[in-house]
Design a protein with these regions (language model features):
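Histidine-centered catalytic micro-motifs
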Residues: 79-89, 201, 230-236
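Sec/Tat signal peptide C-region and signal peptidase I cleavage site
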Residues: 18-22
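Bacterial N-terminal signal peptides
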Residues: 5-17
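Divalent metal-coordination and catalytic microenvironments
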Residues: 32, 47, 52, 72, ...
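Active-site neighborhoods of metal-dependent hydrolases
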Residues: 143-152, 158-178, 184-205, 210, ...
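Histidine-rich, glycine-flanked metal-binding segment
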Residues: 23-27, 34-78, 93
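Alpha-helix-loop-beta-strand connector modules within alpha/beta enzyme cores
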Residues: 213-232, 255
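Metal-associated gating/positioning segment near the N- to mid-region
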Residues: 62, 67-137
């Protein structure tokens, strides 16, 4: 009879539906080398997750529904890809395996070209995206479509100068009127209200190269009102690189916006070894109180569309006009002359590599 209370207790614990003791955490990653992103040296420890949030870091006691043994591995915050062209690829496959498996958890989109706006003349010219009907006209509309489709990565985007410019100007090389600049400013304002980080430009080739410094300043003043920033693929990465960096600095100065220079480099071999001078330009601007920075990529190659090697004048009127010019023997002769000899103010990939075609690789594969 003395054993009855114990027996009753065991039976009670075995009755289906009895409440179980809840784990302290959903997940604990144990024994990894923790690099916390603050600049501190790495340390061995655990990371506990509860309700999709980091709940504890260090030597974590307690239980978890799932545990991962990270011995010999690095545990770090998700990486941010600050220059991504996955805007439309994420709509095709939101799993983003190529990024997730590298530890990338956030992608920054919209460099020069963005997923919106598609207004006015640009909307009429670009009814399809990667062969599918485009379902939106604004950057906010794109965000809504992406939300519905779902994605494994966090996403943020700039509004691209090319979209803004072509929405108003189409394929024209004409100078915009004051009224058209005002229309562009309204599109930038709309995108900023939709959640854009700021304005991003690609002013090395049309249509972005059609914008003057004053044009970009006018649009960046709208960005400044929303606390955004200006990110730029500068106008020239060759022998005009110093002037191009100064232009980016001046835009930040006049518009009152932080500036980020994208993949800063000196591509023309005649100027190799002079990067310290550009660093001095940037440091001088920072000493002045301007908020300016630059980023680089860790390899000695660049990538661009093949059309970037064709002189700017040949792009006027859009792709169909360009194809017509390419079919014209006299126009091709003029293009060849300009490619081989250069045009003042135009960054020329061919002359930048020492007029050596063997240093240029042409690929038909989709690269991003």
């Amino acid at each position: 009879m003395k054993r009855l209370p114990l027996l009753l207790t065991l039976l009670t614990l075995c009755i289906p539906g009895s409440p179980l003791v809840a784990a302290d955490y959903d997940l604990v990653i144990r024994g990894g080398r923790i690099v916390d992103g603050t600049g501190n040296p790495w340390f061995n420890g655990d990371v506990a997750i509860l309700d999709d949030r980091i709940a504890a870091v260090g030597q974590v006691s307690g239980t978890a529904d799932h545990e991962i043994n990270a011995a010999g591995l690095v545990v770090a915050p998700g990486f941010i890809d600050i220059h991504s062209h996955s805007d439309f690829l994420l709509l095709e496959d939101g799993h983003a395996q190529s990024k997730i498996r590298q530890g990338v958890t956030t992608e920054i989109l919209g460099e020069g070209n963005s997923a919106g706006p598609y207004r006015g003349k640009l909307s009429a010219q670009s009814r399809k995206v990667r062969g599918k009907d485009r379902e939106w006209r604004t950057l906010g509309g794109y965000f809504d479509v992406l939300d519905q489709a779902g994605t494994s990565v966090n996403v943020a985007s700039y509004v691209g100068l090319n979209n803004v410019w072509q929405s108003v100007m189409g394929s024209s090389f004409d100078r915009p009127s004051p009224e058209q600049i005002t229309e562009m400013a309204k599109l930038v304002d709309e995108a900023m209200r939709d959640g854009a980080l700021g304005l991003s430009s690609q002013v090395m080739m049309p249509p972005g190269s059609l914008a003057t410094t004053e044009d970009v300043i006018a649009l960046c003043r709208v960005v400044a009102k929303h606390g955004g920033l200006y990110s730029t693929h500068i106008r020239n990465e060759g022998t005009g690189v110093f002037e191009a960096v100064n232009e980016a600095i001046e835009i930040g100065r006049q518009a009152g916006v932080p500036v980020d220079i994208i993949h800063l480099k000196i591509a023309d071999q005649t100027f190799w070894g002079r990067m310290n001078e550009i660093v001095e330009q940037i440091n001088a601007a920072r000493t002045e109180g301007l908020n300016i920075q630059a980023n680089v990529y860790p390899y000695t190659r660049g990538n661009n569309n093949l059309v970037s090697i064709i002189p700017p004048w040949a792009h006027e009127g859009g792709r169909q006009k360009l194809l017509e010019r390419l079919r014209d023997p006299e126009q091709r002769k003029r293009m060849k002359h300009d490619i081989e000899n250069g045009i003042d103010g135009w960054y020329n990939h061919y002359t930048a590599v020492g007029r050596d075609w063997s240093r240029m690789l042409v690929s038909a594969n989709t690269t991003f």
